[in-house]
Amino acid sequence: MDKVLLGCHVSMNKQNNYLVGSVNEAISYKANTFMIFTGPPQSTLRTNTNHLYINQMHELMNSYKIDAKDLVVHAPYIINIANSVDQNKWEFAVNFLIQEIKRCEEIKIPTLVLHPGSYTTGNYKDSLNQIIKALDMVSNYQVNVKIALETMSGKGTEVCSKLEDFKYILDNVKNKDKVGVCLDTCHLHDAGYDLSKWTEFKEQIKQNFNLDKVLCIHLNDSKNMISSHKDRHANIGYGFVGFDTLVNVVFDKDFSNISKILETPYIDKKAPYKIEIEDLLNKTFTNRL
């Protein structure tokens, strides 16, 4: 089998030379891929990409055999392209998403994960149509970047906790090659999908869209029981999804060419990723966190 693409969310900040620091952090965890935000996830503040050490980042990655095509950017949380109630907020979301797409193109990271959003006080189906409308609008700015809509837990008024929602969106967007899906294992579990029956779950995916539409996987355990609709991530092996189930996901041959990204909680202000990556690759839960 090819190498397993396994990494995590890493920081990007000025004191660590932005993207160079992101690569160094990933290397320190023995990760061979990673995910970043291009700026604060809850704000519009952004540092110009000219100052992010893009060339140095790619040189450093080359020396460690990390391929830029495997990297992932997470879009800001404040983008809600599902808003069918407030036109101004929807337009803000679309314009901010366009900015993020441009930044991904400049950094040369080809996958942009996006939370589909919430219907707030609106109608559920209208929200799905707003998502489609937004994706059609931003597609002109996508040259090498694909948007991966993330599976959600169904907390509050979130849309896209059901695979059928993704089928509807993927069937109706104009530029189908520019949109895919990010599977989040915690969110899927919290939404009611039993991932311990992984083969059966993959069949459910195939009833709605092709497996090659899955562009990346967020690998998280869950602090809550199945169908809880909570979205509280647990460390690998310490939650209700379970270590063996997550090992099955990591080593699934159908997904060998896409990145599995950990977004698990820090323990005592320390990242757990080095231990989690080691345990997953060794297929052995060592209970060291």
From Swiss-Prot:
Gene (name only): nfo
Biological source species: Mycoplasma capricolum subsp. capricolum (strain California kid / ATCC 27343 / NCTC 10154)
Keywords noted in UniProt: DNA damage, DNA repair, Endonuclease, Hydrolase, Metal-binding, Nuclease, Zinc
GO process terms (BP): base-excision repair
Keyword check for Phosphoprotein: no
Comment on bound cofactor: Binds 3 Zn(2+) ions.
Name this protein carries in UniProt: Probable endonuclease 4
E.C. number(s) listed in UniProt: 3.1.21.2
Cofactor: Zn(2+)
Family: Belongs to the AP endonuclease 2 family.
